């Protein structure tokens, strides 16, 4: 790893620990709050310095678009498929989901991935290929593989995989009484409002981490 200043090391450690705890990197605002910076712009300057030193990669326009890079730029890092020596957990990769059938039905499984379970905040049950950019500001991009733990309930603020009628979506969960709001992390997308007494809704699981396949 490149030589970091004490403050850069603290920020790098915060990113790594947040990913290990939650499965996702912190936002600029969260970094600023943690270190008492006057604004997220100050955090951005430190992140750019870390990127110049080659220890992280930044995704423009995404508030959680921070990716750790391994020493030597091997691309075997927090968000990439791990090396053969670390492969311990076999997870099915779910592609497109047909209407009316279980998400883990055999016809939905594109392939099996072997991954290191320590990459995730909790043990996942499957991977879901992300389609679209509605969760861009959470650092979840089109083509990413979202690690999902099966669950039928979620607490407010969690990122979930939900089925709405014939559609499967990844959104942030917010519930009040019999009403659920599924919130995108991209201002171009409106929230989805669900009436549990009227709409066909099923929670498939909770996001517990992310794999970003290395570019070819």
UniProtKB/Swiss-Prot annotation:
One annotated GO molecular function: serine-type endopeptidase activity
Gene Ontology biological process terms in this record: DNA repair; DNA replication; negative regulation of DNA-templated transcription; proteolysis; SOS response
InterPro entries: LexA, LexA-like, LexA/Signal_pep-like_sf, LexA_DNA-bd_dom, LexA_repressor, Peptidase_S24_LexA, Peptidase_S24_S26A/B/C, WH-like_DNA-bd_sf
Keyword terms: Autocatalytic cleavage, DNA damage, DNA repair, DNA replication, DNA-binding, Hydrolase, Repressor, SOS response, Transcription, Transcription regulation
Keyword Kinase: no
Chain residues forming the annotated DNA-binding region: 28-48
Record-annotated active site: 134 (for autocatalytic cleavage activity), 171 (for autocatalytic cleavage activity)
E.C. designation(s): 3.4.21.88
Keyword hit for DNA damage: yes
HAMAP family tied to this protein: LexA (MF_00015)
UniProt xrefs under NCBIfam families: lexA
Family, as annotated: Belongs to the peptidase S24 family.
Quaternary structure annotation from Swiss-Prot or TrEMBL: Homodimer.
Role played: Represses a number of genes involved in the response to DNA damage (SOS response), including recA and lexA. In the presence of single-stranded DNA, RecA interacts with LexA causing an autocatalytic cleavage which disrupts the DNA-binding part of LexA, leading to derepression of the SOS regulon and eventually DNA repair.
Protein name per the record: LexA repressor
Organism of derivation: Ralstonia pickettii (strain 12J)
